[in-house]
Amino acid sequence: MTGMDAVPESHSGWTFLTNHARVLASVADDPNVRIRDIAARCRLTERAVQRIIADLEQAGYLSHTREGRANAYRVIPGKVLRHPAEASLTVGSLLALLARDEVDHTPRTADNR
């Protein structure tokens, strides 16, 4: 990987979750997360993460405050999703679904089978 904005792995085609959903979930998991860490987790460039965070803030899905040299993010869980077919669902319900899925897919070891 070369350069700060290099993406660790590329993929082609469509995915079930949007990059916006992935970034929002990362921020919800750790409100003090750095853009660099979001980029690595979501396999995006830092520049793409910055644009997505700006989109999410502009649409009212999250906000941030400066804490020294870092940002602290706040997800707005009661905000409804954008697509008309999902207008009855909130950000909080989406994040709960993603968090539950993450727990369900925890790698099993000999101790937790």
Give short role names for the model-derived ranges.
Residues 1-8, 80-113:
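Amphipathic alpha-helical dimerization/coiled-coil segments
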Residues 9-20, 34, 66-89:
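Short, cationic-aromatic polyanion-contact patches
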Residues 21-26:
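Pre-recognition alpha-helix immediately N-terminal to the DNA-recognition helix
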Residues 31-32, 43:
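Central "turn" residue of the DNA-binding helix-turn-helix
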Residues 37-40, 57-58:
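Alpha-helical residues within the helix-turn-helix
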Residues 47:
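Key DNA-contact positions within bacterial/archaeal DNA-binding proteins
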Residues 51, 55:
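Alpha-helical DNA-recognition elements
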Residues 57-67:
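A short, conserved structural fragment
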